[in-house]
Amino acid sequence: MFHRHLCKLCSKTPSAATLASPLGKLQEERGEGVAKDPKKDKQHRQIFLQKFRERLDSDTTGKNTLAGFIDLPEGISPTMAAVGPLKRGEEPLPPWLKMKVAKGVSRLPRFNRIRNSMREKRLATVCEEAKCPNIGECWGGDEEEGTATATIMVMGSHCTRGCRFCSVLTSRTPPPLDPDEPQKVANAVAEMGVDYIVMTMVDRDDLTDGGAAHVVRCVNTIKEKNPLLLLEALVGDFHGDLKLVETVALSPLSVYAHNIECVERITPNVRDRRASYRQSLKVLEHVNSFTKGAMLTKSSIMLGLGEKEEEVRQTLRDLRTAGVSAVTLGQYLQPARTRLKVSRYAHPKEFQMWEEEAMAMGFLYCASGPLVRSSYRAGEYYIKSLVKQRGAAATKSNTTTTTTTTTTTTTTNTASLAAATVTDSATLQGE
């Protein structure tokens, strides 16, 4: 009971320190150091607000309004609200990159089939992980023509490299490979009902072969279950080991894709130090020379990282010299605050210019646009026809080679037999 009374006394009596200070004396005079009557306090507030309103209403100079207290830029009103204020130095997103998601996409049978299959088997897709704006277009596809495409990422979700443009998680010691992954991917692809699939990978520098053997197992398992499927593999550089590149190129792929990413000058600032511009070119060139042009090769360039026009042009020339047949160009968009900032937003007309120049250089296929990504509409009609033409040409070449070899062998054997007969006849006559 005594404690309760003491608490009440303390709450009403100002402290010695408060009374000793000039501010404390002022508070005491105003009655701020002691408990107040809530009703009186409310009345004081109402009176103050009423007087303040009257003051604003009676003012004719405009100095007592909100605009009179702050300096605003021209064209901005004091009541204008900005949603998501830009940070200093950031450029606003241009209108051509503000893409609305098509209504009803999630109700498309093929879109749902792909999404459900991926989630049930707990497989990662670049489409969802990167929040690709083209997901509805690629997953929905054309139900009759079968142009739907999905990009599956294998070998886990942790990459051993730390490229400054990529939002994929980085780890020096990622989890071990899933031995059942090839079969899971093959089953998922079969359930999707697509006729073109893109399979990409994280870099695994912790593995001796960089994951090349695992990639080959995935490709073989997918093709065994889906023989007519066209398969594009977007793979890494495998430490620059060309023997490992050959191992992957020998698998039943339709398209061998490896991204150059950006122009040579800015590569050290954009990509991981273990990835280089010249190494990527060497990989692509070796695939073409090793397969004697039978394998369709593909690469991709990002704009908006600080490149110059002539540098982009030179990169296209380098890719074409390396034998690359298909190329894509798209706008780099910062995936997270910790990643590289966008240096500029290229206009759609610029992308159109690069597409025209690429085709003039001799590329068989070029997709160029602000929202284009490396696997954008990979399964569209034209690139599928290119793959089939290459496959038919390779089969014809092998058949011709086999026929020629057989004919040569038969001719040689016949000539040898004829020579032996003549020799035997001469021997008999001599006897």
Curated annotation (Swiss-Prot):
Q: Where is the composition biased (Basic and acidic residues)?
A: 26-40
Q: Where in the cell is it found?
A: Mitochondrion
Q: Name one Pfam family in it.
A: Radical_SAM
Q: Which Gene3D superfamilies match?
A: Aldolase class I (3.20.20.70)
Q: Which reaction does it catalyse?
A: [[Fe-S] cluster scaffold protein carrying a second [4Fe-4S](2+) cluster] + N(6)-octanoyl-L-lysyl-[protein] + 2 oxidized [2Fe-2S]-[ferredoxin] + 2 S-adenosyl-L-methionine + 4 H(+) = [[Fe-S] cluster scaffold protein] + N(6)-[(R)-dihydrolipoyl]-L-lysyl-[protein] + 4 Fe(3+) + 2 hydrogen sulfide + 2 5'-deoxyadenosine + 2 L-methionine + 2 reduced [2Fe-2S]-[ferredoxin]
What is a GO molecular function of this protein? metal ion binding
The chain positions of domain Radical SAM core read 142-364
UniProt pathway annotation: Protein modification; protein lipoylation via endogenous pathway; protein N(6)-(lipoyl)lysine from octanoyl-[acyl-carrier-protein]: step 2/2
Give me the residues that bind [4Fe-4S] cluster 1, please: C127, C132, C138, S375
GO cellular component: a single term: mitochondrion
Q: What class of enzyme is it?
A: transferase
Cofactor binding note from Swiss-Prot or TrEMBL: Binds 2 [4Fe-4S] clusters per subunit. One cluster is coordinated with 3 cysteines and an exchangeable S-adenosyl-L-methionine.
Q: Which SUPFAM superfamilies does this chain map to? A: Radical SAM enzymes
- On the tree of life, the source organism's domain of life is Eukaryota
- Needs which cofactor? [4Fe-4S] cluster
Q: Which family does it belong to?
A: Belongs to the radical SAM superfamily. Lipoyl synthase family.
Q: What is this protein called?
A: Lipoyl synthase 2, mitochondrial
Tell me the organism. Answer: Trypanosoma cruzi (strain CL Brener)
